Design a protein with these regions (language model features):
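Intrinsically disordered, flexible peripheral segments
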Residues: 1-161
């Protein structure tokens, strides 16, 4: 079962550093985990990808992230409303509310390097493949927010003796 897919605005390949890097990640913000559990399959330059698209390099597959969803709200009225007014505490690693959208990433070094080398802009498509749900979950709209995909590259310099 598949929910509605998300495709990003084009990202300029010229703005992405892919040469001489040790790792490239695609980061996603505002991923909702209040509903169904799902695998987020990530494809580059394949906005038509769906749950039946083979996850391979030829189809632009970059990797997957996995969300263990809460399955909907089972508490009293107001229980599932996220308190956006709670002050941020840099010494408290917990989310301010269990239903606060999460940030996640996919290690996609080879896929991004391969796609960026073609010189065209890059679109990021996330295909949510539903793996678990309850009657209270909206399985069509598991991706409720703009995911703000960001391509991040890392350079590691290792000194040898």
């Amino acid at each position: 079962m598949q929910g509605n897919s998300y495709t990003s605005q084009p990202i300029s390949a010229a703005e992405i550093t892919v040469e001489d890097v040790s790792r490239v990640d695609i980061e996603f913000e505002q991923v909702d985990d209040s509903g169904a559990s799902f695998e987020g399959r990530v494809f580059l330059n394949n906005p038509g990808a769906d749950e039946n698209t083979e996850p391979n390099p030829e189809n632009g597959y970059a990797g997957s992230f996995f969300i263990f969803g809460h399955g909907g709200c089972f508490g009293d009225e107001g229980h599932c409303e996220v308190d956006t007014e709670r002050a941020f505490d840099p010494y408290d690693p917990r989310r301010s509310h269990p239903l606060t959208p999460v940030t996640t990433s996919v290690e996609a070094t080879e896929a991004v390097q391969r796609t960026a080398s073609q010189g065209a802009d890059i679109t990021v498509t996330v295909v949510p493949v539903i793996t678990g749900f309850t009657e209270q979950t909206d399985v069509e709209n598991v991706l409720k927010h703009d995911l703000h995909p960001r391509i991040v590259s890392y350079e590691l310099e290792v000194e040898t003796a």
